[in-house]
């Protein structure tokens, strides 16, 4: 066994084997995999092993598409062939118009990844799968490449090819401890000796937190018992002369695929069970949980109704084994929060079908720092301090119960709520607030007219449309107040704070006390890493000279990791998170200055407190820090208040605002207004696949300043054509917004992908942002938007169509 290697991958299931294989494909041959028992002895061995292209965003579709291509190549390789039923096809069933509408959106989205789904009616479903009844069925989504694979053979093939490329695999080698050294390298202690390495990867399946504990971290992963049945031969299958397509049914929560001349039927029952919450038997190897048929009988009845032939078929085997889930059902692939040189590939509820892509993207992250796709939807840092073991279990149960029910726009499911609140949460609830969830925080979405107001879930504009319009109108004509909680806030102190930020930020860094700037951070490839508001606060009784770095709520762990990883030992720079200590009250509208002047001492005139200023003050008697910034395009102030004084500040603002028709507003109104202004959302419009020039942010880049992260990559690309360009679109329909991922077409060619969409109430226009081919980026260019199957004209317009000179927000 080696005593020194570059990477140690812990875990010999699909995640570990795929990561090892793809590291060798990236040219790293000095890599090792250690497995406590035999390969595939955890969840992998009993996987139903379905392989589909279907995903709810382009990153997931892309990684699954890679899996399919990889598995097909492995199956055709005569050196180590494997059993892969490729191209059986699969149908996701639907019995509501909203489900069918969703499938049309996902087909539009997948087309941009060169993946082609087909939305079919009930009769066509039955034609393609002769066993199913069309009762209570509208249709489904057809994936022509759906199939299944032998999980053990797949992992052995990946390990075989990795070893051939120079990797080593140590079976029956349990990890007993992990030690990280001052230089951020690791020692992996095993039952057969120690291995020193640069990087550790946790790919331990349901034992993820046993290894996590060795690092001093908890991963938000929980295991669920999952059962499937194997039937005896079904005469209709024997007689069919063709393999049956796979079925996934959100109506009755089951899936089925052909297994020999029968079916494998798996269940996602409502009376589901977590597993391993109180620890896992160390001898649970190649093992299963006890059968519990009664628990799935209601689901089985639904399968009987859909496939009557099952009623005459016997069951030859029952499999009940643990599978892992995260808080949102997507895996955790990437850097482990708070740790250097540590990565994970965990929480893989659909590991076999996705595993080729998981290892592919993770290997790119390890070797190159980023993957070819923006991987935020699978990034481990998307969950923060609220993601404890109990909340994870609650969300795992909820996701399991809704396995085949996709999230609709503006749908926020109830389990594990409220996880994060402020003193204003119950106050705003009493005012009629409908809440959305942002990084666990309960944030006001809009104010509803009655407690029983529940808009229809779907892909069209919903019943809240006019309510949101009224909130926007109030902000435009008078003044509005919104709580924006969870906003990521990092305090940066030390003599070298500005030099540090100059190195991190691609543009000008505000350095004068009392001034604020919007800044962008790039990765080493010169592409968008982060967006931050940087405010310079002078020394006061509240603290020394300092910078407040503010960014999106979801970026809390991501941005702290990025900043900390670039601190130098010889720099006087200190970082401290204030995220959970402060909450923002946004005061916006033409009367905002009047309200602020009524409850805070001092001169708040435009001359004394211009746009992009920051000042400490009191709102009433509540200590606050006010910034003159706007995400709405109206005159606005961000009022940052310690949570202990938040209610006092709120009362003072409400009292002062009473004479000015102050109205509460929420996140959906903000989203409408920011689109009219050309303002972008992190991880919607600002992603790691594009640089600031492609994203329309050239004014925030200073190539003539000193070195900064990503500068050389930008210089290297000078003179080269951009891959895509971000544009603003007018969408010619009043029926529905453009949804992220939707494809833009020119004839049969995909020429762009939507990143954001919504109604602009102040200009009366349906708006969208999209990355499009550069040839289509000029104002006036017209293309067709595939909006849930309807082809709608979309025309490029100038960015910031509302008040393009920004006069209103300067006051």
For each predicted feature, which ranges?
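Flavin-dependent oxidoreductases
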Residues: 18, 177-289, 298-306, 385-412, ...
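Glycine/proline-enriched, intrinsically flexible loops and inter-domain linkers
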Residues: 373-374, 379-811
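Dinucleotide-binding Rossmann-like beta1-alpha1 core, especially the glycine-rich loop
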Residues: 48-128, 251-256, 261-262, 290, ...
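Glycine-rich FAD pyrophosphate-binding loop
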Residues: 24-44
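C-terminal catalytic lobe of FAD-dependent flavoproteins
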Residues: 151, 251, 260, 282, ...
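Central beta-strand plus flanking loop segment that forms part of the substrate or channel wall
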Residues: 48-53, 89-92, 217-242, 298, ...
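Flavin (FAD/FMN) cofactor-binding and adjacent substrate-gating region
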Residues: 70-73, 94-165, 170-171, 176-184, ...
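Beta1/beta-strand and adjacent pyrophosphate-binding region of the FAD-binding site
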Residues: 2-15, 32
């Amino acid at each position: 066994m080696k005593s020194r290697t570059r990477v140690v991958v812990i875990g010999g299931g699909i995640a570990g084997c795929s990561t090892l294989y793809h590291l060798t494909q990236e040219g790293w041959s000095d890599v090792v995999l250690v497995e406590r028992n035999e390969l595939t002895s955890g969840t992998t061995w009993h996987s139903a092993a379905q392989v589909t292209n279907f995903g709810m965003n382009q990153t997931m579709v892309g990684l699954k598409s890679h899996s399919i291509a990889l598995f097909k190549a492995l199956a055709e390789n005569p050196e180590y062939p494997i059993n892969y039923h490729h191209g059986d096809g699969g149908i996701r069933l639907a019995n509501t118009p909203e489900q069918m509408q969703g499938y049309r959106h996902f087909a539009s989205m997948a087309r941009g990844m060169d993946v082609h789904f087909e939305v079919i009616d009930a009769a066509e479903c039955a034609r393609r799968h002769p066993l199913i009844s069309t009762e209570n069925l509208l249709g489904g989504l057809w994936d022509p490449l759906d199939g299944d694979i032998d999980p053990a053979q797949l992992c052995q093939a990946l390990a075989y090819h990795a070893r051939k490329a120079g990797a080593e695999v140590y079976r029956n080698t349990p990890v007993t401890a992990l030690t990280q050294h001052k230089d951020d390298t690791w020692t992996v202690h095993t039952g057969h000796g120690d291995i020193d390495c640069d990087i550790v990867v946790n790919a331990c399946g349901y034992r993820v937190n046993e290894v996590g504990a060795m690092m001093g971290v908890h991963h938000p992963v929980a295991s669920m018992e999952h059962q499937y049945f194997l039937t005896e031969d079904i005469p209709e299958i024997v007689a069919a002369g063709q393999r049956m397509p796979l079925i996934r049914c959100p109506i009755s929560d089951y899936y089925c695929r052909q297994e020999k001349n029968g079916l494998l039927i798996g269940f996602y029952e409502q009376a589901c069970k977590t597993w391993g919450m109180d620890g896992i038997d160390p001898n649970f190897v190649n093992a299963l949980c006890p059968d519990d048929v009664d628990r799935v009988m209601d689901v089985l009845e639904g399968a009987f109704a859909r496939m009557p032939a099952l009623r005459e078929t016997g069951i030859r085997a029952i499999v009940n084994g643990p599978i892992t889930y995260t808080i949102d059902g997507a895996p955790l692939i990437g850097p482990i929060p708070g740790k250097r040189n540590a990565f994970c590939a965990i929480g893989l509820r659909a590991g076999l079908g996705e595993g080729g892509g998981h290892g592919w993207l993770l290997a790119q992250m390890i070797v190159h720092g980023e993957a070819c796709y923006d991987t935020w939807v699978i990034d481990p840092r998307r969950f923060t301090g609220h993601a404890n073991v109990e909340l994870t279990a609650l969300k795992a149960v909820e996701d399991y119960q809704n396995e085949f029910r996709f999230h609709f726009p503006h749908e926020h499911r109830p389990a594990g709520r409220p996880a994060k609140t402020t003193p204003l949460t119950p106050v705003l609830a009493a005012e009629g607030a409908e809440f959305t969830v942002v990084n666990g925080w309960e944030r006001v979405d809009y104010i509803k007219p009655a407690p029983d107001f529940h808009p229809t879930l779907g892909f069209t504009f919903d019943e809240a449309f006019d309510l949101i319009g009224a909130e926007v109108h109030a902000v435009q004509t008078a003044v509005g107040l919104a709580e924006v909680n969870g906003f990521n806030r990092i305090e940066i102190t030390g003599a070298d704070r500005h030099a540090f930020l100059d190195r991190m930020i691609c543009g000008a860094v505000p350095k004068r006390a009392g001034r604020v700037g919007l800044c962008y951070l790039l990765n080493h490839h010169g592409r968008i890493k982060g967006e931050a508001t940087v405010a310079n606060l002078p020394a006061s009784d509240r603290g020394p000279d300092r910078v407040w770095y503010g960014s999106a709520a979801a970026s809390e762990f991501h941005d702290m990791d990025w900043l900390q990883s670039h601190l130098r030992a010889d720099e006087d720079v200190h970082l401290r998170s204030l995220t959970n200590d402060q909450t923002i009250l946004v005061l916006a509208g033409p009367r905002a200055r009047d309200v602020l002047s009524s409850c805070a001492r001092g001169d708040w005139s435009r001359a004394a407190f211009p746009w992009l200023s920051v000042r400490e003050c009191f709102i009433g008697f509540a200590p606050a820090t006010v910034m003159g910034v706007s995400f709405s395009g109206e005159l606005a102030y961000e009022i940052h208040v310690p949570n202990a004084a938040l209610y006092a500040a709120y009362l003072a603002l409400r009292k002062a605002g009473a004479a000015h028709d102050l109205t509460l507003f929420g996140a959906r109104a903000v989203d409408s207004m920011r689109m009219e202004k050309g303002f972008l959302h992190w991880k919607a419009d600002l992603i790691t696949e594009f640089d600031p020039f492609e994203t329309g942010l050239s004014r925030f880049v200073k190539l003539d300043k000193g070195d900064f992260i990503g500068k050389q990559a930008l210089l290297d690309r000078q003179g080269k054509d951009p891959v895509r360009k971000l544009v603003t679109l007018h969408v010619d329909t009043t029926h529905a917004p453009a949804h992220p991922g939707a494809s833009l077409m020119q004839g049969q060619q995909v020429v762009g992908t939507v990143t954001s969409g919504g109604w602009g109430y102040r200009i009366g226009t349906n708006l969208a942002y999209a990355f499009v081919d550069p040839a289509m980026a000029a104002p006036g260019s017209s293309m067709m938007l595939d909006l849930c199957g309807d082809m709608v004209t979309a025309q490029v317009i100038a960015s910031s169509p509302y008040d393009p000179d920004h006069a209103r927000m300067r006051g």
